[in-house]
Amino acid sequence: MSHEILSVAVFVPLEGHEQSAIATVRELSSVLAKGGYSRDILYREPQGEYVLVRYWKSDDTRRAALEDAEAQRRWAKLAHEIRIVRVYESLEEISL
């Protein structure tokens, strides 16, 4: 049985690239959603850091997304628009 995998990325847009970076994140999120790979939520912290929360459908879909040419193009573009602060590839839920 597959379960969603939570990933979190914290990033800041490079100077002068905020609008293009957010547009690229939106494009990437759309590609991943249309491919059935994941669903995303984007948050902005008051000091300018962005937090991208991604729920991968499964480990298999995450691997498949890494091979998707449309997604690869967006990830490559983002590399020139943002600086990654922190990435959590897989977070496990702890029951409370």
Language-model region placement:
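Short, surface-exposed ligand-recognition loops at beta-strand->loop->(often short) alpha-helix junctions
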Residues: F11-A23
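Short coil/turn motifs at secondary-structure junctions
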Residues: L14-G16, E45, K57-D59
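Glycine-rich beta-strand-turn "strand-cap" elements at beta-sheet edges
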Residues: M1-L6, F11-V12, S38-V51, R74-L96
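An amphipathic, aromatic/His-enriched active-site/gating alpha helix that lines ligand/cofactor pockets
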Residues: E27-R39, Y55-E89
